[in-house]
Amino acid sequence: ALHAAETRLLVFGTLHTNSAATAVDRLTDGFPPDEQEQVRIVLSEVLKAVVAQLLLRKKGGGRVPAFEVLRGSAALANAIREGKTATITSLIQTGRSHGMVGMDQYLAELVFQDLVDVDEAADKAVDKEYFKSLVEKRRAGEIK
């Protein structure tokens, strides 16, 4: 798949992960340790986007999806190339103007649309403290 992407073919893949950052880690960790640096280099050059999805219990029954969207950027490429995937979550949190949506931001929005219980959303949050601060700031009227 990486070789196909290098030739400018559009490649889609699916992984069972809870966040975009975890998906990037899973992609590189799937290779032998002696190949991971090269994989990170290639991935940093070809990755255009990652979409993560979770299903949560909806108030009143059923399920509702929550999404995280990571878009390719120079900062993302550097993080992947240097193996600093722990910074990807913060890139997403600050990349809203570039079309990125953080899982925790999306979860907080579902809470405020009264679609899911705050405890259900908190359980699925990537960064529990960040999610908690979003909920508190929204309740205090500091953010919309």
Where would I find each of the regions flagged by the language model?
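Short, flexible helix-loop junctions that flank or precede catalytic/ligand sites
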Residues: 1-144
